[in-house]
From Swiss-Prot:
Gene3D superfamilies according to UniProt: Phosphoribosyl-AMP cyclohydrolase
Family annotation (InterPro entries): PRA-CH, PRib_AMP_CycHydrolase_dom, PRib_AMP_CycHydrolase_sf
PANTHER family for the chain: HISTIDINE BIOSYNTHESIS BIFUNCTIONAL PROTEIN (PTHR42945), HISTIDINE BIOSYNTHESIS BIFUNCTIONAL PROTEIN HIS7 (PTHR42945:SF1)
Keywords of the record: Amino-acid biosynthesis, Cytoplasm, Histidine biosynthesis, Hydrolase, Magnesium, Metal-binding, Zinc
GO molecular function, one term: zinc ion binding
Residues that, per the record, bind Mg(2+): D77, D79, D81
Subcellular location: Cytoplasm
GO biological process, one term: L-histidine biosynthetic process
Protein name as annotated: Phosphoribosyl-AMP cyclohydrolase
Cofactor note: Binds 1 Mg(2+) ion per subunit. Binds 1 zinc ion per subunit.
Cofactor(s) the record lists: Mg(2+); Zn(2+)
Pathway: Amino-acid biosynthesis; L-histidine biosynthesis; L-histidine from 5-phospho-alpha-D-ribose 1-diphosphate: step 3/9
Length: 126
């Protein structure tokens, strides 16, 4: 029997991009990387666990901040090389900047403009 993880088209580093999407609103919250172990653990625990390329270790989202992502559904795209996690974001903050989403800047008139408020000072989170 084929392991379901073998269906994922992992990159040369054994990673796949994973997009966290709010399960209710559909808003994109963040993008991170997953390896086989983090995707397996995410499916098992129903909480988002990513692979930190900078720390070279598993990263259980919310372990430090309390902003855990509860996974409602895991999707694989048609090319099998991108994962979407539909999540319920505990605390309403996904971004390390203290915002709901990491995608808080909009390109307007030739520059990037922050359009989403900081919900909590990152110094109070970390």
């Amino acid at each position: 029997m084929k392991d379901w993880l073998d269906s994922v088209n992992w990159n040369a580093d054994g990673l796949v991009p994973a997009i966290a999407q709010d399960a209710t609103s559909g808003r994109i919250l963040m993008m991170a990387w997953m390896n086989r172990e983090s995707l397996r653990l995410t499916a098992e625990k129903q909480q988002a666990i990513y692979w930190s390329r900078s720390r070279n270790q598993l990263w259980h989202k919310g372990e430090t901040s309390g902003h855990v992502q509860h996974v409602r559904e895991i999707r694989l795209d048609c090319d099998e090389d991108v994962i979407v996690l539909q999540v319920v974001q505990e605390g309403g903050i996904a971004c390390h900047t203290g915002r709901e989403s990491c995608f808080y800047r909009v390109f307007r008139n030739g520059e990037w403009v922050a359009v989403d408020p900081v919900l909590k000072d990152p110094a109070e989170i970390y």
